[in-house]
Amino acid sequence: MFPFGPHSPGGDETAGAEEPPPLGGPAAASRPPSPAPRPASPQRGADAASPPPVAGSPRLPGGPAVSPAERAGEFAAPGALELSAATASASQAKLSPSSSPRRRSRPDWRAGGRSRQGLGAGLGGPGARLFGWLRERSLGRGLFVDPARDNFRTMTNLYGSIHPADSVYLSTRTHGAVFNLEYSPDGSVLTVACEQTEVLLFDPISSKHIKTLSEAHEDCVNNIRFLDNRLFATCSDDTTIALWDLRKLNTKVCTLHGHTSWVKNIEYDTNTRLLVTSGFDGNVIIWDTNRCTEDGCPHKKFFHTRFLMRMRLTPDCSKMLISTSSGYLLILHELDLTKSLEVGSYPILRARRTTSSSDLTTTSSSSGSRVSGSPCHHNDSNSTEKHMSRASQREGVSPRNSLEVLTPEVPGERDRGNCITSLQLHPKGWATLLRCSSNTDDQEWTCVYEFQEGAPVRPVSPRCSLRLTHYIEEANVGRGYIKELCFSPDGRMISSPHGYGIRLLGFDKQCSELVDCLPKEASPLRVIRSLYSHNDVVLTTKFSPTHCQIASGCLSGRVSLYQPKF
């Protein structure tokens, strides 16, 4: 270590008259001294000005390509990063053969706090890159934050390169229309719900047929839901739900009876292991799979509403969303599946029409808020609002299973009613995806609604829980059939049935995440890729949870698998 200079805070005037010889053995020690005369040492207390930099000062042989000032800025402690340009120039002059050796001045360590302000901006090279990387990491971005997220980003880019000619067809055409597709959580099995009472199982990687569950039900199979990597449930128009085990597909695990009409979809709460089903009888039924036997599972009716179409749980199971054919979207906040909701037992937080701007129109009365919308909605609204709980009138209270009644705004349908036929949720719970059709079946729309922050706490609030952010008009074909659309596993893309094929939609051209490109007003979804390979109307589509693959099924029974070719 070099001794302190005579004018450093702890230096001695007599100490360090000359620097020690450089390391490197006798050859380095025998180096002749510089011919330049040694300048006189300044007086104590005088300001010693550094000499101007020596132009064209050569580097030491075999030394690094960077200057000493850059090395000091890269490796020194934070307090030493404020070495002045004159000090760096003096170091260069010292290393020059034509310059005389000088004492190295000690940096002011008390200036470390001031130097930190310019760490990222004042320095170039590795220092700026380092602090730029730290900043991106603190914001949750970059390659080292979430590898799975960046893998999905790569997969999103690959989806844009898929061509219809790359599709693979699965042999399902003898089993009727395809109503639903579902991958196992590990992506190893693809299940197909068919119109003619059967369920087909395929290996999505090799496209080979695994098993056909003949007469899985006595009527159309509508929906399939995996509970884990081996157990899955199916529901049917025969009003039953069946549980299956991939390890033993010869027989059902059990059959569940409880609905009185067509059962349309299945949800599963992984926290409580409760199965949730809904049907056209208007009932939402809870099944306790923890106490399942060959005769069935204990069950109870959880909720009832008229014109029920679809029911979904958010990924954290804190909300339940229910869509109706009369254009309403019901949201149960602070969900508690252990408590049955009889008519009149749940508080209604508000009944409003969602919008993408601030021109919300509501009228309130002493009995609660009333929806301002199409006249065809009033009967359903009156039957719901007349049972409003007084508990929700207290400001600041958001009780368990609080009901919110919304009329989602649909572009072009402001003055007409609409039917919400399909309902999906963002994988991270940020938004809900709806497929809406007009009551006259002359228009179809795909709409994305962002969840607003915070749960509603008052019966009438100036802000709804949902806000329309993106939309796109769909092909008005296959009237009377429900088209099931879906999010990609990372939520960056949407796969939507469109005529005889599917469209991959994004929130912007770069397939950014929703939170990174939220518009101030509702804007159209961007078409990333259109894939048309069917000869009939496509009814359902699904992303693989683990591979870069999309499946679609059509009315004539064909299943297509899309994946990029390398």
From Swiss-Prot:
Q: Which residues carry this modification: Omega-N-methylarginine?
A: R141
Task: Report quaternary structure and partners.
Answer: Interacts with DDB1.
Function of the molecule: May function as a substrate receptor for CUL4-DDB1 E3 ubiquitin-protein ligase complex.
Basic and acidic residues composition bias: which ranges?
377-388
Family in the record = Belongs to the WD repeat DCAF10 family.
> Which gene does this sequence derive from?
Dcaf10
Q: Which organism is it from?
A: Mus musculus (Mouse)
Residue ranges annotated as compositionally biased, kind Low complexity, are 87-100, 354-374
Listed GO cellular component terms? Answer: Cul4-RING E3 ubiquitin ligase complex
Q: Where are the WD repeats?
A: 173-212, 216-254, 258-297, 303-342, 415-455, 477-515, 533-566
Q: Which InterPro entries match?
A: DCA10, WD40/YVTN_repeat-like_dom_sf, WD40_repeat_dom_sf, WD40_rpt
Q: A Pfam family name for this chain?
A: WD40
Q: In which pathway does it act?
A: Protein modification; protein ubiquitination
Q: What processes does the entry annotate via GO biological process terms?
A: protein ubiquitination
Note whether Repeat occurs among the keywords.
yes
Q: What is this protein called?
A: DDB1- and CUL4-associated factor 10
Region annotation (Disordered) maps to 1-72, 87-123, 354-413
Instruction: Could you list this entry's UniProt keywords, alphabetically sorted.
Output: Methylation, Phosphoprotein, Repeat, Ubl conjugation pathway, WD repeat
Q: Where are the Phosphoserine residues found in this chain?
A: S50, S57, S67, S96, S99, S100, S356
